[in-house]
Amino acid sequence: MEQVAKLLNGKGNIAILTGPSGDAGGLQRMEGYENILKNYPEIKQVVAPADCQWDTASAQSTVESWLSAYDLDAIVCENDGMAVGAGNAAGANSGIVIAGVDGTPDASKLFRMAVSPVRFLRTAALWAANGIEAAVKLLKGETLDTTEIVTDNTWIDSSNVKDYE
């Protein structure tokens, strides 16, 4: 969300596509989005977040409806599948920032076509490596410094998408 806010120069109209209501990962992402948006009072969430069940077709249908009713500058999606649906609905080079999470090959196609200027990559491999490292420490009787493990994130856009395919 921070990168989206920067791309919008701190102002604009956004909408958010979420996974299933009650999903822990989605709830944490939404909490993070809301915390960041507090720092950007000129960014308005013009429609309530839509539960698209992590589904591409549902996201596409939702965004098609939104685009007929709202002037959107960005659509933030809690996964790349929904970002693909949002990109399909918005069309190539619409100027709408579409952000997704996961780093999937389908989403990479959107970035090669310049449908969206940003995508967030988080990899299961990095999560697994960090988790294994923590587990090994615990098995050795060591104490972890924290209850949270924070992983580095990489922003991907049309300028570097080929590096991540």
Predicted segments with their positions:
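A residue-level marker of the well-folded mature domains of exported/periplasmic proteins
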Residues: 1-165
